Regions:
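Mixed-charge, Lys/Arg-rich low-complexity intrinsically disordered regions
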Residues: 1-15
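Acidic, low-complexity, intrinsically disordered interaction modules
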Residues: 19-70
Length: 71
């Protein structure tokens, strides 16, 4: 997986690409927390999905999101 910034993630999401999101303090290979797949479903916006994800994210794992795509 390749790490990308939020601007690139937003552009790829609008094109219909699969984006993975993870709290910023969690390592990518962590066995307890795995990346969550986000994709366009039912017309939900990128910001709506990310805001919902961040609202329920434990603060011990980070306060921001890290975005990834498959190589």
């Amino acid at each position: 997986m390749k790490k990308i910034n939020i601007t690139t993630a937003r552009k790829l999401f609008s094109k219909g690409e699969k984006i993975y999101v993870l709290p910023n303090k969690v390592a990518l290979g962590n066995p307890w927390v795995s990346p969550s797949l986000i994709e366009k479903i039912n017309g939900e916006t990128f910001d709506y999905i990310i805001n919902a994800y961040c609202a329920y994210m434990p603060r011990e794992l980070g306060t921001r999101c890290a975005f990834y795509v498959n190589d």
